[in-house]
């Protein structure tokens, strides 16, 4: 973000995306791993905290330089430097965090999402694979959870945002159904009009 700000003048419209693939490859205590949710679940919130600490330090360093210049400025430069301080553009940008498949059931998803939000994530991405069977995005043989289970995890993330007072938190819900078999792709319908029936009505055979 320091380089981005130097090049563009500010970081408006920019963000950081912490993908599960990147975390698994670079932040696991077990060393580089494939994108199969084998890294420690706390790796993402820990990295969010680390990044925000670094970005705030970048702000502090740049502002510190400006205040030093202000202290040593003559009358001609003081107004210009004061305006730079007042119009300072932060290095801090939104962070999108990949929670993979939630690392467990809906409650586990809620607890981890809450930790990510507390660390500073404003957006959480979740996918509908079974956590214990997670495959890399380019691989076949994926196993997806039932639709109701996925919705429970999405709601768990929503509840985490609301509990922490973040009313405009963003959830990116991604499906891997195309790479999964029909056993998990089709929703179970118990009666007309239920959630499963609504999903099945969208399928054209």
Predicted regions and their residues:
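Hydrophobic faces of well-ordered beta-strands that scaffold small-molecule active sites
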Residues: 14-18, 95-99, 124-126, 171-175
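Phosphate/pyrophosphate-binding betaalpha-module
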Residues: 123, 146-169, 186-195, 199
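Short, well-ordered coil/turn segments that N-cap beta-strands
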Residues: 12-14, 90-93, 121-122, 165-169
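N-terminal glycine-rich anion-binding loops that anchor highly charged ligand groups
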Residues: 2-28
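Active-site beta-loop-alpha junctions enriched in small/polar residues
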Residues: 1, 21-23, 100-104, 129-131, ...
């Amino acid at each position: 973000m320091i380089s981005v700000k130097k090049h563009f003048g500010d970081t408006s419209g920019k963000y950081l995306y912490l993908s599960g693939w990147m975390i698994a490859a670079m932040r696991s205590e077990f060393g580089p791993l494939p994108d199969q949710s084998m890294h420690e679940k706390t790796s993402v919130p820990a990295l969010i905290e680390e990044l925000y600490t670094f970005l705030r330090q970048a702000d502090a360093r740049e502002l510190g330089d400006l205040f030093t210049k202000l202290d040593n400025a003559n009358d001609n430069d003081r107004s210009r430097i004061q305006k730079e301080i007042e119009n300072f553009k932060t290095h801090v940008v939104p962070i999108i965090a990949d929670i993979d498949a939630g690392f467990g059931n809906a409650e586990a998803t809620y607890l981890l999402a809450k930790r990510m939000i507390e660390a500073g994530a404003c957006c959480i991405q979740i996918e509908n694979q079974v956590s214990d069977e997670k495959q890399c995005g380019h691989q076949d043989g994926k196993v997806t959870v039932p639709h109701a289970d996925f919705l429970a995890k999405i709601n768990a993330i929503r509840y985490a945002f609301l509990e922490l007072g973040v009313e405009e938190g963003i959830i990116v819900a991604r499906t891997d159904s195309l790479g999964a078999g029909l056993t998990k792709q089709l929703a179970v319908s118990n009666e007309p009009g239920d959630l499963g029936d609504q999903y099945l009505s969208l399928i054209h055979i």
